[in-house]
Amino acid sequence: MPGVVFDLDGTLVHSAPDIHAAVNKALAEEGGAPFTLAEITGFIGNGVPVLIQRVLAARGEAPDAHRQAELQGRFMAHYEADPATLTSVYPGAEAAIRHLRAEGWRIGLCTNKPVGASRQILSLFGLLELFDAIIGGDSLPQRKPDPAPLRATAAALNEEVVLYVGDSEVDAATAEAAGLRFALFTEGYRHAPVHELPHHGLFSHHDELPDLLRRLLA
């Protein structure tokens, strides 16, 4: 059987609430005003450095490498200390992956979240064992939408990877750049209408995913 690679945030787990909490904890330490969940959700997708850049820009702060590193470090300390209290696995996601594994699929994860935090979250939800390869936002010099992380994940699976499953503009662009078909989860963190994202199939509930993959392989 071929391989399939998944994104994490907004695709397999609804993690925005914990990311939101960690950002606001870091800002509260310096007396900063909190962001709303919707605001932080809108900043997710390009990795932690870009998340923090967007937070600082939204506060009206000029780009500053020292400031970026300082806030990013405090954010990660809070996030890694409590990454999953408010996070949930999307309904049907675990069952879908277990179903695919039972059919012989090799399963990979390609995310812009740091690999340590990604493994921690997967472990807390009992999902870590389901993945044959994991590439995070700090595994390579490049991050999505550069195709290098997705290609590295595919290579690590030692199978022909035929599909990337994600939820956002970043994921769609990554799959396109890597030359892979893309399955779009419509209930994640995308900003644009579905029709504006290049995709080969879409689904709104993970129960639909195994049948969708079979159709895309036909």
Swiss-Prot record:
The EC number(s) this enzyme carries: 3.1.3.18
GO molecular function: metal ion binding; phosphoglycolate phosphatase activity
Catalytic residue positions: D7
Annotated GO CC locations: cytosol
Metal-binding in keyword set: yes
Binding site for Mg(2+): D7, D9, D167
Keywords from the UniProt entry: Calvin cycle, Carbohydrate metabolism, Hydrolase, Magnesium, Metal-binding, Photosynthesis
Cofactor: Mg(2+)
Catalyzed reaction equations: 2-phosphoglycolate + H2O = glycolate + phosphate
BP terms from Gene Ontology: DNA repair; glycolate biosynthetic process; reductive pentose-phosphate cycle
Keyword presence, Metal-binding: yes
UniProt cross-references to InterPro entries, sorted A to Z: HAD-like_hydrolase_sf, HAD-like_sf, HAD-SF_hydro_IA, HAD_sf, PGP-like_dom2, PGPase_prok
Pathway the protein contributes to: Organic acid metabolism; glycolate biosynthesis; glycolate from 2-phosphoglycolate: step 1/1
Transmembrane regions listed in the UniProt entry: none
Family: Belongs to the HAD-like hydrolase superfamily. CbbY/CbbZ/Gph/YieH family.
Function of the molecule: Specifically catalyzes the dephosphorylation of 2-phosphoglycolate. Is involved in the dissimilation of the intracellular 2-phosphoglycolate formed during the DNA repair of 3'-phosphoglycolate ends, a major class of DNA lesions induced by oxidative stress.
Record protein name field: Phosphoglycolate phosphatase
Organism: Cereibacter sphaeroides (strain ATCC 17029 / ATH 2.4.9) (Rhodobacter sphaeroides)
